[in-house]
Regions:
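A structural signal for short, well-ordered beta-strand segments and their strand-loop junctions
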Residues: 46-50, 91-100, 142-147, 185
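Glycine-rich, phosphate-binding/catalytic loops in enzymes
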Residues: 63-68, 114, 159-163
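Short, solvent-exposed loop/turn segments at secondary-structure junctions
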Residues: 52-56, 101-105, 148-152, 188-192
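Active-site and ligand/interface coordination hotspots across diverse enzymes
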Residues: 1-75, 79-85, 127-130, 134, ...
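C-terminal capping/extension of enzyme domains
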Residues: 1-14, 21, 117-129, 152-218
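Low-complexity, serine/threonine/proline-enriched polar segments
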Residues: 68-109
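Proline-aspartate-enriched helix->loop->beta-strand connector
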Residues: 131-148
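Charged, often glycine-rich, active-site loop that binds/positions anionic groups
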Residues: 100-126
Length: 218
């Protein structure tokens, strides 16, 4: 049995830490929270993409940067329950999830505001560069984007550059070398605005269909 291979996200912690010096001054309180990243993601598996880690907004003051242990509580938050179920249904890899931004905030509009802030573009571009490094390093078999803003940044080409669209399979394709990686856009899988069960089942079917067709014809 082959050993599981991983891309080590934790090796980028210094780059993540340094990126906060490029965050606009109005966001200094968020800069003090520093980064929150997962330690690793599985290569050649299913990669789920969110927008940013949550945070207990009642906490005040600075934090230490955190590299969460994926095998020991790194995915313990209830948010990951439905994404884990999706991963189990697809069944091609261990659970792997990465956020596009490492900034800690519960209200997601904060990330949207930072993306739109002219004084924070250095931070945004550096975070997206690191995100691309993770995706390219993991070289997943499929990407599932489970956040509207993350989907927008990918669809518009800002996060991963221009994607091709496969009209036959009905999915966008991201190229890593010669490898064509299907990108599926989904609504939230957890929380107040989660997709309904029918849409969830359809997502599972579509992912399985595309992966099966790729294995047959590519």
């Amino acid at each position: 049995m082959m050993a599981t291979d991983y891309y080590i996200v934790g090796n980028l912690r210094k780059d993540y830490e340094e990126s906060y010096s490029k965050l606009g001054h109005r966001w200094k309180d968020y800069a003090q929270r520093k980064y929150d990243i997962i330690d690793k993601v599985q290569k050649d598996g299913l990669l789920l993409v969110g927008i940013n880690p949550s945070f207990d907004e009642s906490f005040k003051g600075s934090c230490e940067g955190e590299v969460r242990d994926s095998e020991n509580g790194g995915y313990r938050h209830p948010y990951f329950t439905k994404p884990k179920k999706l991963n189990e249904e697809i069944g091609i890899s261990d659970f792997s999830h990465v956020d596009m931004f490492s900034l800690r905030s519960r209200p997601q509009h904060v990330v949207q505001d930072i993306v739109n802030d002219p004084d924070s573009q250095g931070f945004v571009e550096e975070q997206l560069r690191l995100f691309r490094m993770i995706v390219d390093g993991a070289s997943p078999r499929a990407i599932v984007v489970v956040n509207a803003l993350a989907s927008h940044l990918i669809r518009t080409g800002r996060a991963l550059g221009a994607l091709d669209y496969d009209d036959v399979l009905g999915v966008a394709m991201y190229k890593i070398g010669e490898k064509r990686v299907p990108v599926f856009y989904s609504g939230m899988l957890s929380g107040a605005h989660t997709i309904d069960n029918g849409s969830f089942d359809r997502l599972i079917w579509h992912i399985k269909y595309v992966l099966n067709m790729q294995s047959v014809f590519f």
